[in-house]
Amino acid sequence: MFQSKISGLGFYVPDNVVTNDDLSKIIDTNDEWIQERTGIQERRHIVRGQDTTTSMGVKAAKIAIERSGISNDAIDFIVFATISPDYYFPGPGVELQKELGLKTIGALDIRNQCSGFVYALSVADQFIKTGMYKNILVVASEVQSLGLDMTTRGRSVSVIFGDGAGAVVLTRSDDDSGILSTHLHSEGEHAKELAVLAPGMGGRWITDILSENDPDAAVVFPYFWMLLKTWSSLKPNFF
C-alpha cells in the first residue's frame, strides 16, 4: 500500500482586516473580552464583489501547487471542503477545476462544517493509499462573515469566525513518511445544538419551498422550471 504526504501548502485570506476594536463599535464587546475567551485579535472578512469561496480557494490552490513542484497537469483529483459554496450546486470543486485550467478530472465536494478539511484530507489519503490517484488537490474555503449575526445577540459566534482558504497537494509516497492514519467519528445526538436549519428540504416538496419565495426568481432553486415540471409529474406516483 502507498503512503501519502503533503508536498505543497498554500493559503489565502482577504485584505479586509476586522479587529476586536472594530467589532466593539457594533457589538457590546471589547478586545479584552474576546481575547480572554478566544485568544483572537483579528479576523479577515471579504469585501463583496472581490472574493468568493471559489476565488479564495483558487488563490490558495495556486500557491500549494507551485510549492509542490508539480505541474497542473499532474493533479488528478480535487477534494473541496466548504459549507459556504457560491451556489447550491454545482459545488466549488468543478469551478476550481475550471479556474485552474486543470484537466477534466474528478472533483468531490465535502460538507462537514469545522471538520471539513480533516475529512477532505482523510478521503484524499485513502484515494492515494489504494493507488487510485497520485496527486490530489485538497482545498478548504469559507465565507462565514456574510452569515454571522453581527449584533450583541450573536457575539459569542461572530467574534470567532472569519473568511479564508487553505490548500494542500497530497502526493503519493513510496516511503514511510506522510500521513500514518486517520480516525473519524461523529455524535449525531448533539447535531441540532450546533445547526443551521435553513435552507433545507425538511421533507417538503420543492414546490412547497418555492411557494414561500418569489417563483419569478429562478435563482431560488437551480433549474427551477425543469425541476418544477419533473417533480409535478412524479409527485402523484408517490401516493
Where are these regions (language model features)?
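Flexible, glycine-rich active-site loops centered on histidine and acidic residues
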Residues: 129-165
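Short beta-strand segments
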Residues: 10, 81, 111, 136-142, ...
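Conserved catalytic cysteine-centered active-site region
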Residues: 35-55, 83-136, 141
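Short acidic, glycine/serine/threonine-rich loops at helix termini
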Residues: 17-18, 89-91, 147-152
